[in-house]
Each structure stands twice: as C-alpha cells, then as structure tokens.
Amino acid sequence: MDYIGIDIGSTASKVVVKGDHDIHFVLPTGWSSKETCQTIKDRLLEDSVDVLSDDSKVVATGYGRVAVDFADHVITEITCHARGGREMAGDECAIIDVGGQDTKIILVSGGMVQDFQMNDKCSAGTGKFLEIMANRLGVTLQELFDMADKGTVLPISSLCTVFAESEVINYIGEGQKREDIAAGVVDSVANKVAQLAMKKNLPEKVILTGGLSNSTYFTKILSQKLGQTVSPTEHGRLCGCTWCRTP
C-alpha cells in the first residue's frame, strides 16, 4: 500500500509517498493546478505508483487541493499542519507556516486546532516577496539569506510588495551594498511574520514550516523578533503533504 500526500501550493506543488515506495518531489504549480495534478499523476506512474490503484490512498491539501480529482480525501492546510505540529511538538504548540501566497499562524491546544490567523491579501510577508526581491538583486533565495547574514539592515518600511520593490530599486540606485539590502528585505519579512504571530498568545513551543524553515538565518531572525525560540522543521517545504497523507 502507498500513502500519498499532495500539497498544491500557490507557487509550488509538493508530493510525498510512503509505504511500498519512498518518493518525494517538488515542482512549480504553474498557471493551472489541474495540469499540475496531471503532471504529478504521470510522474508517479513513471515510478510505478498508480494513484488510481486500490493499493494507493491519496490525500490532498493546499491552495489547489480541489483540483486533485483523484484524491480519496481533501483536507485544509490548517488541519494537516495542526496534525503535524502535534506529532512534532506535543498537544500545546504553535505552527508558523510561511508559504508563497500567505502566512498562517496555527495554535494547537489539547491536540486540536484552537485558533489561527492569516495575513491579508498582500504578499509582502510571504515567500513570494523574498523571491521577487532575490530576483531583483540577481541572486537565488539561498544566496539572499547568505548575503543578509553578512549585511546591516537597511529599513524597508512599505507594507506593499510593489512599493517595497521601489525602495529596493532606490537603494540599488544609491549604490548601497547588496548585503545590506538583502538584510533589509529579510528583516522586513521577519517583522511582518512576527507582527502577525504576536496577535496571538504563543505557547512555549513554536515551530516553523514552509520553504523558509530551511533557512537557519531566517529562523534566527524570527526568533529574535518574537523573543522566543522558533524551531525549524526538517524538509519544511514538504510538511503539508507529509502531514496530510494517511495513515
């Protein structure tokens, strides 16, 4: 039996297979979630995993979960992250999930979702913002973090991605160091995530999921902003599909 978790995010889609096979991969979601689902189905079949077989159980989550028309079950990201948080940190914890489109703060109490908070529609406090700014600076996301770790923060005050990008362009025009601009960019996102999280009474155990959990620098900065330890998760980008699959 294969247990398959599929997380169709706004920018990336993630797949984890456990059971008879041990597979995981990430691919761009692209403009069509349905086409992405077909790509996932075809790729799994290349690895001898037939999602339509009685020997496969598929659970879908994420922004485009309804497009996974071959899923046996569909659950929200809130539910699957709460399940995973309980497994990792116990019945009392908070999960900060920084995705491409949104950021979620999920409080777990007694092993159940107690409350959650999401950012507004602007992408300024999300991974997409960092991706846009990294492209503007001509570096990868990992290189952005590496540069930020060596820089001094230049303030980026705008709450809007478009206006924030204008601030970055102005800094570039002034000849400011890329390391300092990168530090300002990461600091800006950490500020917005922390402000969102501090709207809730966070428990002692806080874990970070999503692609940014792979960055020790971002985890460190966010911990400083919150005044408490934020623990990264291994393979943070895969948490949604790992925690949604059954059993």
Question: Model-found features: residue ranges?
Answer:
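Short glycine-aspartate micro-motif
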Residues: 3-7, 57-59, 93-97
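Short glycine-rich, Thr/Ser-proximal phosphate-binding strand/loop in the N-terminal lobe
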Residues: 3-39, 43, 113-123
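Short beta-strand-loop/turn "lid" adjacent to the catalytic site in phosphate-handling enzymes
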Residues: 21-29, 49-79, 114
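Glycine-rich phosphate-binding loops at beta-strand->alpha-helix junctions
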Residues: 63-64, 202-225, 233-240
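Conserved phosphate-binding catalytic cores of ATP/NTP-utilizing and phosphoryl-transfer enzymes
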Residues: 64-115, 194, 198, 242-246
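Glycine-rich phosphate-binding loop plus the immediately following alpha-helix
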Residues: 110-156, 160, 246
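Glycine-rich phosphate-binding/hydrolytic loop that grips phosphoryl groups
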Residues: 127-131, 231-247
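Adenine-nucleotide phosphate-binding core of ATP-dependent small-molecule kinases
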Residues: 164-199
